[in-house]
Amino acid sequence: MAPKAKIVLVGSGMIGGVMATLIVQKNLGDVVMFDIVKNMPHGKALDTSHTNVMAYSNCKVSGSNTYDDLKDADVVIVTAGFTKAPGKSDKEWNRDDLLPLNNKIMIEIGGHIKNNCPNAFIIVVTNPVDVMVQLLHQHSGVPKNKIVGLGGVLDTSRLKYYISQKLNVCPRDVNAHIVGAHGNKMVLLKRYITVGGIPLQEFINNKKITDQELDAIFDRTINTALEIVNLHASPYVAPAAAIIEMAESYIRDLRKVLICSTLLEGQYGHKDIFAGTPLVIGGNGVEQVIELQLNADEKKKFDEAVAETSRMKALI
């Protein structure tokens, strides 16, 4: 990697805007904000570049409407894609409708990555992410350790926050794992939740939280995106922060353990499919895939999550 990382945001919408700001605040590298909307990324880049002063940073932020600016990127973050089916009302479409539309975008982006930055570390955000990350992996030809999908970092941040609020503790003191898939099939692992290193079961035993309250928190975690949308907003700040945590671990070789969608090669009994599991992300990309020991019920839910990803992939 060059002394200063080149980070290209493919998609400069709401998530892209927050990501660019966080990159400057952390002084992670130079940013290219790419989008197909003419001039828009240039305006956002100009605005964001001014925050260098307040952040005591020195990051170049530029806008682009051409894929040529992917050239020699160190990190590529892909948020581009449809979030709903065009021409259909909210009641007329479902996530399956996005598959052919976003697959075309992955084909296009993958070709440009292959030609311009085949050694970059790729983070895929486009939904359904566990399918799209596999498609972009195929279309770009990047090594399996150089591409991951957003999922568990965001999902667990929500779960950790809700638990911390119930127990009145610092959110960072809650540790939790969500594996399998990003979406309704995510697998929340109650057995692995700790608070300050103490198993959550101790807090249940001491009546600080009940199983029913925990189940409600699980349900809220799964449905958080819908909750935000129903409040006439859009989830983009926390997703952006989760993505930048992943990128920073790669750029700065932090070797953080982060839950992301990665290519399974026998873990959990599955091969040639992307799914969420803890990873060590460092300067070489995915440096270790951590397979958690699941009980029968957890394994059944994990298998169902993978089956849903396989079903969607088969529709393309």
Swiss-Prot record:
SUPFAM superfamilies: LDH C-terminal domain-like (SSF56327), NAD(P)-binding Rossmann-fold domains (SSF51735). Pathway: Fermentation; pyruvate fermentation to lactate; (S)-lactate from pyruvate: step 1/1. NAD(+) binds at residues 13-15, 34-36, 67, 79-83, 125-127, 150, 154, 182. It catalyses: (S)-lactate + NAD(+) = pyruvate + NADH + H(+). Gene3D superfamilies: Lactate dehydrogenase/glycoside hydrolase, family 4, C-terminal, NAD(P)-binding Rossmann-like Domain. Keywords: NAD, Oxidoreductase, Pyruvate. The active site is at 182 (proton acceptor). Substrate binds at residues 95, 158, 182. Its EC number is 1.1.1.27. NCBIfam families: PRK06223.1 (NF004863). Homotetramer. This is L-lactate dehydrogenase. It comes from Plasmodium berghei (strain Anka).
